């Protein structure tokens, strides 16, 4: 399963009402470290299919969502469970560290 593209339109259903954890990658296409994280996010989306949702928010297209999560730097990775942020990491991270957020 490919990662979700999270937008204002699907945010409520895909994130806030999700019955499984949601890992969100706030990114932009012009951001080098964000592009480095892309393959890691894709791998986690495949590996955690059915156990967690993995999605991406393009901060250039979804400024309101970025502001709502207080994103000041990208990439920012946020884990949401039961509609609440439970973990957050800023900057490019190794796969093991991002995966540990899901544990």
Label each residue range with its predicted role.
Residues 59-65:
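Structural microenvironment flanking redox-active thiols in thiol-disulfide oxidoreductases
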């Amino acid at each position: 399963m490919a990662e979700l593209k999270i937008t204002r339109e699907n945010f409520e259903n895909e994130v806030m009402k999700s019955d499984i954890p949601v890992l969100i990658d706030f990114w932009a296409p012009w951001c080098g470290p964000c592009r480095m994280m892309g393959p890691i996010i894709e791998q986690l989306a495949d590996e955690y299919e059915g156990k967690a949702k993995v999605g991406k928010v393009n901060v250039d297209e979804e400024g309101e969502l970025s502001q709502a999560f207080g994103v000041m730097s990208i990439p920012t990775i946020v884990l949401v469970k039961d509609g609440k942020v439970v973990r957050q990491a800023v900057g490019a991270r190794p796969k093991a560290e991002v995966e540990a957020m899901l544990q």
